[in-house]
Amino acid sequence: MIDLYTWSTPNGRKISILLEELKIDYKVTSINIMRNEQFSESFLKISPNNKIPAIVDRSNDDYTLFESGAILIYLAEKTGKLLNSNNKEEYYRTLEWLMFQMANVGPMFGLSLIHI
C-alpha cells in the first residue's frame, strides 16, 4: 500500500496516473498548497522540502520519498514494469525522456496554473 500525499497539480497527477497504470493499491491524502498545508510538521516528516507529491510505501518499512521523478522511477522499479533494467540503452533512454519532461515540459504545465 502506498500513501500518496498530493494536490491537483501536474506533478501530483503524474504519480496517481502511474499508480493506476501499475495497479498499485494507494490512498490519497490531499495537501492543499493553496492553504500552505505543505508546511505542516506532519508533512515535513514525509517531504522535508515542503513539496508535493510525496509517498510513504507501507509495504517497505514506511519508506518515504518525495520529488515526482524519483517517485516515478521508484514505483516502476518496485513493480519491474516500464523500466527495462536488463537493457541499459533502453533504460537510460527512458530516463532521458523522463528528465526532459521534468526539466522542460513539466514546468510549463505548472506555470499555467498560476493564471487560474
Where is each model-derived feature located?
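GST-like domain detector, emphasizing the conserved glutathione-binding G-site
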Residues: M1-L113
